[in-house]
Amino acid sequence: MDGTAIYAGKKTEVVAVDLLDANLASNVTRQIYGQVVGLNIYDGGAGGLQLNIGGRGLDPNRSANFNTRQNGYDISADVLGYPESYYTPPPEALSEIQVVRGAASLQYGTQFGGLVNFKFKSPNPNKKIEFISRQTVGSYDLLASFNSISGTLGKFSYYNYFNYKEGKGFRPNTSFNSRNYHGHFEYLLSDKTKIWFEATISDYLAQQPGGLTDAQFQDDPTISIRERNWFDVSWLLGNVRLEHRFSNSTEFSLNLFGLDASRSALGFRENRVLSLDPGEERELLIDNFQNWGTEARLLTRYKIGQQDAVALIGSKYYQAFNRQRQGAGPATAGPDFSFVDEEFPTFARRSTYTFPNLNLAFFGENIFNITNRLSITPGFRFEYIKTQGVGNFTRVFTDLAGNLISTDIQEEDRTNERSFLLLGIGAAYQLAKQTELYANFSENFRSITFNDIRIVNPAQIISEDLEDETGFTADLGVRGTVNDLLRFDVSGFMLYYSNRISANNQIIDEFNRVRNITDNVGTALILGIETVADINLKKILFQANNDIKLNLFLNSALTTSEYIQSDLNNAIDGQKVEHIPEVNIKTGLRFGYKNFLGSIQYSYLSEQFNDPLNSEPFSDSTAPNAGIIGTLPAYDVMDLSLSYTYKNWRLEAGINNLLDNSYFTQRATGYPGPGIIPAEPRTFYTTLQ
């Protein structure tokens, strides 16, 4: 348990950020999450501005299949309709990152991926003021500055930081600058009650070099043929939290949170990666997100006979109103996010949508200690969801000279109202003092999102029969420690995924044109064995020398998958599920002598597909989906991180992609592509704290 949360019988992992030797300034995900098992990661984002993680066959794009939170409240654009995370807290500000797999659907939402919760550092309770400054420089003009101030004054405490980051990236037409502020202000009303307020402001602007075809990547992965593509994000989060302890056995928490945010994408974005930018008007898409919610939790400890028990009940209210507009942007080169539809009446991509959402949830879990060793934790979540999509897409018809003939406005008005009950159960059995057998089963649900139902491209079709995705997750494993020599967690999982949605489905329409349809493609079954082990070699080899630190770690996921039912005329029956490498391994050494510490990590992922048909890459670079559809080749990458501490000073340095391997982890269907997004080559960084 943690406050008013229950984790008994669940697959849980915690990243202790302060103990990491990693490139925190650039938010290098494979290093920070190196011991979180089975994650599939997109590596193509310069500066680590966004978090892109998936696992167990879930698309890593902007971590949309996880419920992402900070200090227990939602931070994504729209939890149901647009669960993408454009904002990610800087790792330097975090004490830990909590990851709970699919069984988190009962307490935190319905997602298949589970929960990722970023816990910020707490105010320093022993000082009135504490100032920490971290300055980083690195390859490709990377400059990052992180500064925090913290302290306690009687009943009042605070933690604030400001983070600035800029750089250029390794490809032409790549640059970014970001600013993040977070303020935490806490007041102790009594020895049983405290209240705090948090505000987060995040803003970044990035120039995007576009994607590549397979042939372009093989010839030169550093090239760019997009000079006018820009991406801008503005994020404002607020939260008020009340915590009250009624007694030593009963605790209550209440979060009241809200979001006011926007994301703007501007550039030349054609379906064919090889299409050259003519320097005319650009496509502009602006999404505005406004949502608010409240979540209350009550946890109480009680007895059933002689055995302890714990009950948790909670409820959540969430309301969102989001707007999206697409149209012509200026025919200039810079980041001017202004619509100029009147100036370019023949621009072919124009749409306007509103997406109101309403969500009510009630949930509960109870830990029953059957014996001193065995506990069972059943739970439920009742959901009421109402999602709407109202708007239109304008089709433009021109003559051969490009003159406007007519327009056809396609109206969309979709309302989807549903309520359902999700059930789950977990169990834990104490095999030994420090070893536990655990198991859990939980139903999952993924709502149709805005991207699933809005048309932004004349070549796109939305199925009239599109349905929500449903399924369940099950885990069975053993975890524990052995005499301070070995820490381990070995488990098997099964994920059953019905009505899986994909946009990478091609059909030929009545005019013999190739078009992409967003539809439910079938039912997927995913099975895997996940292992995390950490061996304390110091205890074995250098037991008498307390100045030495030496640990060997292994993080492996062996996964198999298959579409067991096809909704597309049996086209995908027996095919492998996309976004799943059958072998996913991260291993390495953490070493140190006195105040000198370091780590070296090796990562390997086998080949994976990015569409349900398991398509091979297009040999013809002029094909409509060349660079967008195809396999993701196997790749490996090695990282080295070092640090030295002297009194209040700390020096960090490292090399990312030590072997300078050329690889990619993403074939983007839209921004930041479309096409292959190459990962960074060998880079260096140095941080002074």
Which residues does each predicted region cover?
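Extracytoplasmic beta-strand/coil segments of soluble accessory domains associated
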Residues: 30-77, 95
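Transmembrane beta-barrel wall of Gram-negative outer-membrane proteins
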Residues: 137-166, 171-208, 230-248, 317, ...
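Face-selective signature of the C-terminal outer-membrane beta-barrel domain
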Residues: 191-200, 234-397, 430, 489, ...
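Gram-negative outer-membrane beta-barrel transporters
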Residues: 297-299, 372, 487-498, 513-614, ...
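C-terminal beta-signal and adjacent terminal beta-strands/loops
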Residues: 493, 538, 549-550, 604-619, ...
